[in-house]
């Protein structure tokens, strides 16, 4: 894992002790409203929010809903003269839209005033969900690094290793390329009489988040990020879509074309699939002894190939928040050393680098040992004003190929002009 060190003094500045009672006056007679996604990190915040409520004599209202509903619910509030939400959690591919629309407040003056050192964060996450064009608008909250979730009990079994050697003529090692991985996943499903893959092909976000891994793995991208000309007509894009389509047809669980990440988690929890190219944040669900059959049987491996997809969420203050000082106190508290560490131990996905070197954390979540490598070999969607439209456009391409059976090369070639239009005149890409 790449080392991201910060001085102890800097760490204590960011991660200081609980606020004094005097500081709590800024939240007096105020409630904090936050809209969040139904994921383990939201649960981790909910489990400790009473500490802030007690220290600041206030109430934190967390409204947790399905991701697909969040954007449409946030936009009317953010567009109003006075909004309902005091704190925002911003998905990485909303960053460009929210910044361009002026919906999130710049934090640099507050950071300087309170001597907050953002150097404790993994740099890639700070660039993805922290700064935009050199100014800070967010503090990274949690990431959704992706890679291969797999059944270690099956893959490590001598019988599997022997069968693999007989099939492929070599000793077992984790595949080095996406093409090799796809062949192994198809073979393993037949070998074990299971689904080789658990997949999420639902439009728009699930299939795009999943398939973007395939695109990045084979060296493709949506654009040449120097010229901002679309590269979706290149051979790499067709290769990625073809591999994805092949696995969806020949290795995935029934109904995968309409599945989301909850369905992937359920397929894995029920012990019905060997592999998934999916989110690390699913592990707390897979470790839930109440309804998972794969407790302590799953492990994580970085995606084979060149790069994987990296997404993240950041804490932000709405520009129309009624009490920005109280909102800022919440951001400082929730990203304090104590709160961030408690969230991590509770199954959250930490953004502060020091946590990944903590022995207690790694003992509780051993699959997180390879997160540093995964983050260092990943990238996010471009920070652009029309990133939501980018996702919709790629989802349209994938739907045409996966559902309608169109040839990927032709569909992708036709999409190039659509992708080019999305970046035309974008102020964030100058």
What are these regions (language model features)?
Residues 1-32, 111, 420-430:
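Short, low-complexity disordered leader/linker segments with a strong preference
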Residues 22-33, 53-54, 134-135, 186-193, ...:
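Immediate post-signal peptide segment of exported/extracytoplasmic ligand-binding proteins
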Residues 26, 92-147, 179, 210, ...:
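Hinge/lid segment of periplasmic solute-binding proteins
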Residues 27, 31, 37, 295-296, ...:
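Long, aromatic- and glycine/proline-rich binding clefts that accommodate carbohydrate-like moieties
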Residues 29, 108-121, 162-174, 197, ...:
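Short, solvent-exposed loop/beta-turn-alpha elements that line the ligand-binding surface or hinge
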Residues 47-122, 131, 135-138, 158-159, ...:
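Extracytoplasmic "Venus flytrap"/periplasmic binding protein-like
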Residues 54, 79, 134, 154, ...:
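Extracytoplasmic/periplasmic substrate-recognition and gating elements
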Residues 180-188, 220, 225-258:
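Glycine-centered hinge/linker elements that transmit conformational signals in sensory
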């Amino acid at each position: 894992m790449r080392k991201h060190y910060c001085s102890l003094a800097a760490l204590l500045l960011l991660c200081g002790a609980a606020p004094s009672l005097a500081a709590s006056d800024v939240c007096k007679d105020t409630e904090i409203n936050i809209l969040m996604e139904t994921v383990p990190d939201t649960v981790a915040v909910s489990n400790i929010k009473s500490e802030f409520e007690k220290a600041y004599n206030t109430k934190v209202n967390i409204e947790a809903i399905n991701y697909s509903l969040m954007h449409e619910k946030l936009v009317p509030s953010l567009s109003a003269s006075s909004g309902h939400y005091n704190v925002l959690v911003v998905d990485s591919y909303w960053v460009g839209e929210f910044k361009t629309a002026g919906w999130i407040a710049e934090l640099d003056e507050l950071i300087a005033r309170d001597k907050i050192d953002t150097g404790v964060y993994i740099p890639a996450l700070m660039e993805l969900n922290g700064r935009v064009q050199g100014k800070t608008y967010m503090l990274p909250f949690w990431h959704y690094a992706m890679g291969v979730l797999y059944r270690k009990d099956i893959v490590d079994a001598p019988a599997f290793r022997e069968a693999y050697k007989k099939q492929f003529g070599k000793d077992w090692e984790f595949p080095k390329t996406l093409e090799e991985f796809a062949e192994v996943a198809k073979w393993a499903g037949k070998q074990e009489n299971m689904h080789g893959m658990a997949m999420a092909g639902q439009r728009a976000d699930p299939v795009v988040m999943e398939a973007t891994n395939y695109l990045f793995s084979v060296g493709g991208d949506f654009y040449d990020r120097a010229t901002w000309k679309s590269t979706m007509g290149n051979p790499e894009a067709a290769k990625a879509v073809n591999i994805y389509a092949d696995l969806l047809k020949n290795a995935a669980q029934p109904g995968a074309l309409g599945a989301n990440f909850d369905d992937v988690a359920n397929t894995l929890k029920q012990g019905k699939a060997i592999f998934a190219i999916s989110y690390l944040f699913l592990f707390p669900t897979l470790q839930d002894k109440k309804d998972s059959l794969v407790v302590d049987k799953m492990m994580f491996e970085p995606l084979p190939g060149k790069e994987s997809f990296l997404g993240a969420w950041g804490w932000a203050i709405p520009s129309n928040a009624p009490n920005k000082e109280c909102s800022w106190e919440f951001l400082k508290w929730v990203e304090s050393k104590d709160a961030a560490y408690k969230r991590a131990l509770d199954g959250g996905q930490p953004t502060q680098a020091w946590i990944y070197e903590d022995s207690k954390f790694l003992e509780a979540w051993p699959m997180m040992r390879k997160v540093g490598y995964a983050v260092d070999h990943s990238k996010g969607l471009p920070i652009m004003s029309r990133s939501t439209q980018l996702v919709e456009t790629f989802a349209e391409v994938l739907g045409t190929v996966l559902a309608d059976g169109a040839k990927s090369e032709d569909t992708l070639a036709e999409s190039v002009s659509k992708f080019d239009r999305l970046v035309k005149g974008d102020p964030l890409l100058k």
